[in-house]
Amino acid sequence: AAVSNTILDWAQQREMGFSYFIALGDSLDIDVDELLDFLTRDSKTSAILLYLEHLSDARRFVSASRSASRNKPILVIKSGRSPAAQRLLHSRSGMDPAWDAAIQRAGLLRVQDTHELFSAVETLSHMRPLRGEKLMIVSNGAAPAALALDELWLRNGKLATLGEETLQRLRDALPGSVVPDNPLDLRDDASSDRYIKAITILLDSQDFDALMIIHSPSAVAPGSESARALIEAVRNHPRGKYVTLLTNWCGEFSSQEARRLFSEAGLPTYRTPEGTITAFMHMVEYRRNQKQLRETPALSGNLTANSVDVHRLLQQAIEEGATSLDTHEVQPILGSYGMQTLPTWIAGDSAEAVHIAEQIGYPVALKLRSPDIPHKSDVQGVMLYLRTATEVQQAAEAIIDRVKMTWPQARIHGLLVQSMANRAGAQELRVVVEHDPVFGPLIMLGEGGVEWRPEEQAVVALPPLNMNLARYLIIQAIKSKKIRGRSALRPLDIAGLSQFLVKVSNLIVDCAEIQRLDIHPLLASGNEFTALDVTLDIAPFIGDRESRLAIRPYPLHLEEWVEMKNGERALFRPILPEDEPLLRAFISQVTKEDLYYRYFSEINEFTHDDLANMTQIDYDREMAIVAVRRSGAGEEILGVTRAISDPDNVDAEFAVLVRSDLKGLGLGRRLLEKLIGYTRDHGLSRLNGITMPNNRGMVTLARKLGFDVDIQLDEGIVSLSLSLISTDKQE
C-alpha cells in the first residue's frame, strides 16, 4: 500500500492517469500472471508497471510475462534483494540474479529503485520506440553535457557520430564559437533561435537514433520560451513524429512551466542529465531484451545425448546411497552429453597413485577424494605438476596427513590422479548449476574462486538455453567483467563456450535428480573446453520433472515418425526457434490462395518479427507441430498445425497449413489428428477454428474428424468446434 500511494501521489502531481491501479495484497484470489493476462488483452492499457515482493508460481509468471511483453512494455521493480529486506517482508523470494535472469528472459525491463521507476514511467508514457541505440546530445553548456556523457559511459551507452554533411550544415548555420560535434554545445549564450536551427538540421539527418536536448537556466533563452519553440519545431518537421526525443530542462522553479508544456505535448522530460540518460538506457535495455526475445538462434549442431544411460547411472548411484559424485564418477555422465573431461583414475593410497602416474606419464595432478570436504583447497587437497614418482608419493602422503590433522572426522576415499592439463594460454572458467527456491535450476557462468558468491562473481540464466541465449550470457559476463574476453594468448571462443553451456542446459533439463553441478575449473583452450574438476550433487526426484523448471523445455516426447501416402517418412515434431529459415522457405512454397484461406488476407511477405512469433513459442500456452522431411540441403517443412490456448487453458484456437504441392498425401489430417491428441492430453476442453466456405478441403476434413461445422454465409466464414472432453468425463 505504501508504494502504491507513493506512485499515485507522484502521478497526480504529474497529471498522469492509469487505466487500472490494482493492489493484489497476498494474492489469495488472483495472482500476478492472471493480472498480466487480463491487462495484455485490454486495449486501454499501453504499458504495465509491476511492483513485486514474491511469486507463488514462477513458471506461470514467466509464461504470462513473455506473452504480455510481445505486445506492450512491462516495467518491474522488485524489493527484497537483501536477506534483511526479505526478513522484513516475510518473503522467501529467491536469489536476486535469478530475478534478473527471469525478467530479461521474459523481455521485461527491471528498474532498481523508485527514482528509476518514476523516470521509466515518464519514458513509457511519452517516448517513441527506439529504432537503434545511438544518442545525440544538444546542450547550452559543457557541464551538463559532460554529466550526461559520464552517465552514458558508465551505463555502456553509445554516442552517435555525425556525418560530414550534417557537420558542414551545422558549421554554416551556427556561430564560430560553436564546434559541431556530439555533444553539440551551443554555448551559454544560445538563444531559442540557435537551438531551433541546430535541431532542425539534426532532424534532417539519419545519423542518430535518439535526440537528447539539455537546457540550463538562461536569461538569453528562458526555459518556457525555448520549450515552446522546440515543441513547435518538432511538430512542424516531417520527421518530428518519428524521432525519439528526450528533454532535460535543468533547474526547478524556472523550468516548471517548460516541463508542463512538454508533458502536454507528449514529450518525455526529466530534471537532471543523469536521469535523462537513465531513462534512455532503460529503453535501450528494453529494446535489447525484446530483440533477444525475437532473435533467430544459430543451429547448435549435433547435440544428441544418451539420456537413458545417464538416468540409469544416476538412479544406480542414488540406490547405493550416494548424494555427491566426483570427477571420476561424473565423467561418463558429462561424456554422454558431449562434454569433455580430463581422464581421471582413482588411487587407494600413495603406492597406487605412483603406479597410475607411471602408467599415464608425467606430469600429473593429485587431488583428494572425500565426500566430507566440499573444497579441496581447504586442506591443500590439490597438488599440481608432479613430475616424479617421489613427488607423487610425498604429495599423496602429505594430503592424507593434512586431512587427518585438520579434518579428523572426514572420510577419505582415496586420491584422484589426472594427467596434467596443458594450461599454457588457456583460460579457467567456472560453470555452476544451483537450485533457486523460486525459479528452480539456474546456470551460472564466472571465473569463481574458493568462496563462490554468484551475486558478485557470476552471470545467471534460466534453462533451457539455445545458442543465442548462451551467447548473450557469455557477452553479459564479459561486459560485466565476470569473465575475461580472452586469455593471454587468444580470445575466448564464444561459439564453443555457447555450445558447452547448451550441453549443460540439456543435461539439467533431462535429469531432475541433479541438485547441483559445479565444474571448476573449466579449461578453455582454443575451441576445446575441458572439465578438470567436477562435483555433482544428486537426490531422488518424485513428481513432474518439467515442473521444476521456470520455462517449459522442448517437448521431445511429442516427436513421431509418420509415413505419408507416398511411402515417404516425415518427422512430426514441435516447432523450434531455429526453424525460422525453414518456415520462411515453407511459406514461399504455399500458393497465395492457400495463404488467403489461412490468414484471411493477402500476405506479401512475413517480417522477421512475424516469423519469430511463429517459431519462438511458449510451449505452455501454444503448440505448433511441423512435419519435416530430410532433404539434400538439410530439412524442409512440409506442413504445420498450431493451437493457441487461452490463459485459463480451457479453449484453443487452431489452424493447419500444408505445402500446396504436397496436398493429397494425408499430411493435413495426420497433423490435425496429432494436434487434437496433444490438446486433449494437455487438459483443454475445446478446439476452435475458422475457415472460409470455399475452403472445401478444410471443411470436409473437419467433419471427418468430428468437428461441429457452422457455415455462416452472411459473415463469409465457417466456424469449426471440437469438444475434447470424453463422454465419460462429461457424464
Which ranges hold each PLM region?
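Catalytic-core regions of core metabolic enzymes
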Residues: A1-D533, F541-I542
